[in-house]
């Protein structure tokens, strides 16, 4: 990932690979359905040479490049419909594999990129309507979605039938209070999958609410920096990439922290740069380095313009 900024600056033809991005994204997600392993009621990844790979983490990046290259190519209604259909296909594959957290991230990312490219609020309203209808359908179609909604409503009433994880998460956050129990003094092992989906609860318990709030502020600071870089980019392709990757990052942070604090139903996504998981960490490194490459590219362009004057 450290060479990504150099590649972004030196190679100028990323915007021409729309079909390649779509094919790679769809095949990678479809492979999970064919050979994926079930974890927590969802097919999230598969094992290659003893290494667990979660394609959806890397496909989020490829998806952003696909949408950006497609909108850079044309903003005609026909192309928007075709792009929307392919984007929806990505989301439907994730829904079929029951990776609803990643599906929601791609959905929000697409809506944001669509608005940035077209500045048409009607598209956003149509997308929100379709998303609301899809949420209702998912509630009645998938048992584990209904369970998560019930757990979100009252995790203590469903303590023995799915609410244990969220209930223990709330206990851990409450136990840590503002200053925490101390490093290694908590009992995060009482929360299932604490090192991935519920790492924020362990941090709150051992290091306290103040430290947890600082972590949230760091995430918000990273997002704001993404948005500042996106606003400064003149080329539509690069602007869309920065907006898309920044949106994917902050939505993932929101879903993770919101799920463990019972603000929203748990979606099973990881906290970038914090949760355990090779695919998650690698994809986050790539995201940050792509945006860094865009920043360096913009800075070099400004320096060249200044020297030309």
Task: Locate predicted features.
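Short secondary-structure boundary/hinge segments and terminal tails
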Residues: 190, 221-222, 276, 303
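Hydrophobic alpha-helical transmembrane segments of multi-pass inner membrane proteins, especially
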Residues: 1-162, 201-261, 286, 290, ...
């Amino acid at each position: 990932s450290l060479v990504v900024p150099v590649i972004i600056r030196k190679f100028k033809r990323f915007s021409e690979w729309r079909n390649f991005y779509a094919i790679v994204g769809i095949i990678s997600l479809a492979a999970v359905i064919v050979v994926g392993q079930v974890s927590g009621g969802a097919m999230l990844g598969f094992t290659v040479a003893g290494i667990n790979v979660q394609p959806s983490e890397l496909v989020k990046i490829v998806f952003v490049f696909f949408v950006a290259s497609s909108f850079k190519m044309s903003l005609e209604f026909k192309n928007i419909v075709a792009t929307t259909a392919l984007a929806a296909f990505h989301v439907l594959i994730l829904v079929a594999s029951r990776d609803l957290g990643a599906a929601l991230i791609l959905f929000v990312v697409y809506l944001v990129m669509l608005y940035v490219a077209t500045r048409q609020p009607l598209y956003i309203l149509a997308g929100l309507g379709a998303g609301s209808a899809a949420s209702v359908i998912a509630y009645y179609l998938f048992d584990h979605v209904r369970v998560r909604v019930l757990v979100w409503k009252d995790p203590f009433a469903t303590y023995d039938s799915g609410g244990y994880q969220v209930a223990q998460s709330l206990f851990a956050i409450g136990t840590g209070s503002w200053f925490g129990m101390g490093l290694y003094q908590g009992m995060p092992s009482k929360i299932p999958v604490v090192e991935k989906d519920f790492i924020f609860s362990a941090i709150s318990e051992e290091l306290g609410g103040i430290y947890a709030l600082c972590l949230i502020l760091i995430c918000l600071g990273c997002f704001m920096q993404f948005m500042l870089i996106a606003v400064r980019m003149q080329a539509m392709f690069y602007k869309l990439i920065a907006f898309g990757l920044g949106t994917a990052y902050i939505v993932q942070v929101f879903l993770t922290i919101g799920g463990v604090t019972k603000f929203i139903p748990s979606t099973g996504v990881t906290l970038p740069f914090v949760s355990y998981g090779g695919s998650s960490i690698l994809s986050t490194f790539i995201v940050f380095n792509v945006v860094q490459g865009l920043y360096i590219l913009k800075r070099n362009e400004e320096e060249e313009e200044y020297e030309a004057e």
